[in-house]
Every structure is written in structure tokens, then in C-alpha cells.
Amino acid sequence: MHIRIGTRSSKLAMIQAMMVKDRLDSLGIETEVKGFTSKGDINLDSPLYSIGGTGVFVDDLNRMILKNEIDIAVHSAKDIPSFIDDSLEISAVLKRDDPRDVLISQHSLNDLEASSVIGTSSLRRIKELKTLRNDILIKDLRGNIDTRLKKLDNGDYDGIIMAKAAYDRMRINRRHFILNYDDFVPAPNQGIIAIISKKDSEINDVLKKINDDETYNDMKAERLILSGLNLGCSKPVGIYAHKNRIFMRFYSLKNDDYKDIVMDYNNIDLEFIRSEIHDYGY
């Protein structure tokens, strides 16, 4: 068996694809990694949420699976839209890495001076920042991680926010501050590397051997909220499943309000959640 692994060509995406390749190689499977540039990598002038959210990083690769140009696609699970083509599935995930966010800066969030400039393109992070520090400035930040760090070094920003999992996978060594769960509820599926394939592919039997069951169940619970409420990838929502509990934070699109909800993730009540956020503009 020979498996063609598709991924974005960014350094982080290639690292994640190689993590999957290494696990398949350990099973004696012949693999190759193919890197591609996505629409989201080309359009760096617009805020991410204005061009379709993180799903723009996923769609092109998924189409390549359907065209038989690649066999599987490796994605950051948080980038995968709530709904994908009916003939595709998330067939496996690797064990979840730290789902929290980090602030890369010389100063902690509490110690930043007023009017400090923080870079992020995430509506969730923007809302979280404004809730905690409405005296700082938030500036859109796009590009791969090396580009973002260069902009930080050039003085365009006083700090930037990124996923702790990405920070660790890239082996970045900079002064940083981990943002706790209470203040920054992680994005749904943050820290999870997911593999998409055709539902009827014989490759899926192999992929099951590298799947982490606990992470897969957490991923499904978080995605159930996204799909059940038709939230998509770009809404200001934090969702984190852990040890059979699911923690949710919904930020209003109309004002600075937010709602925290906690449930047993084996008994998710979508109607209750919908009633709690009915006037949030989703």
C-alpha cells in the first residue's frame, strides 16, 4: 500500500503531516507527503473571518482527495468546517496536544501597557482580549508563523497570540505566557491533528491503527456543537471537551456579552444551548 499525504506547504502544516507519516511508516506503510498552497495562504490582505474562516485552508485539499490526486489530507482539526463533503470523513486523529493559547510577548497580558498592539485574526481571541483588556489595541495578523514572528520582531506588534500546540510543534523558544482556560476557552478541536479520507477507502483500516480514541471522542463532541448550531469555524466561540465534560463560551456578535455553558458531553442539549444564545446574532 502506498499513501499520498496531502497538506498545506507551510512549515507547521508540513511538520504535522510528517507526524502522521512517521506513524504510518512505523506500521510499514509506504508514504509520501505532498505540499500545496491553499486559497487562504494566498489572500493575506483580508481578515480570515471575512474570506470564509479557517475552512479556506481545508477545502482545496479535500477536493484533491475527491479528484484522486491525494489519498488523505492532514489538517489542524480546528480548521475543518462543521460540514464536509458527504463522501469524506475524519478517519483518524492523533493524540491531542495542549489546546490552550499562548501570548508571545515580553510582557504578560496583565502587564501590557495601555494601547499595546496585539496581533490575531481570530474573532474568538479578539473577543477574549477585549473582555480582559479593553485598553489594548488589536490588529489583524495573517501569514505563516515565521511571518508573524518577523512582524513581531519588526515592532509591528507588542505581542501575538497563537495556539500552544503550534508553538510546541514549531519548537519556538521565545518569552511567552500560557493563557488559562478560564479566560481563553480554546477553539473547538484546537491542538488536534486530523486526517480526512474517503469514507469507502481501504486506507481507513490502516488509519484506525494510529487513531487516538479519547481525542477522537472529544473532537466529535466539540464538532457536534458546531454542526448542531451551524456555527462554522469563524464564530467567536470557545469549546473544549475533557473527561466527559464539555465547556463552552459563546460571545455575542452584537455586544460584549458572553455566556458560559458546561455539560456532560454524552448528553449535549442543543436546544438548551440554542435558547441560551438566541439573541447573540449567530
Curated annotation (Swiss-Prot):
GO CC terms in record: cytoplasm
Keywords annotated in UniProt: Porphyrin biosynthesis, Transferase
Highest taxon in the source lineage: Archaea
Reaction catalysed by this enzyme: 4 porphobilinogen + H2O = hydroxymethylbilane + 4 NH4(+)
An example molecular function term from Gene Ontology annotations: hydroxymethylbilane synthase activity
E.C. no: 2.5.1.61
Pathway terms, separated by semicolons: Porphyrin-containing compound metabolism; protoporphyrin-IX biosynthesis; coproporphyrinogen-III from 5-aminolevulinate: step 2/4
Enzymatic class: transferase
Pfam families reported for this sequence: Porphobil_deam
Any single GO BP term: protoporphyrinogen IX biosynthetic process
InterPro entries membership: HemC, Porphobilin_deaminase_N, Porphobilinogen_deaminase_C_sf
Cofactor note: Binds 1 dipyrromethane group covalently.
Cofactors (names): dipyrromethane
S-(dipyrrolylmethanemethyl)cysteine PTM sites in chain numbering: C233
Annotated function: Tetrapolymerization of the monopyrrole PBG into the hydroxymethylbilane pre-uroporphyrinogen in several discrete steps.
Family statement: Belongs to the HMBS family.
Additional comment: The porphobilinogen subunits are added to the dipyrromethane group.
Protein name (record): Probable porphobilinogen deaminase
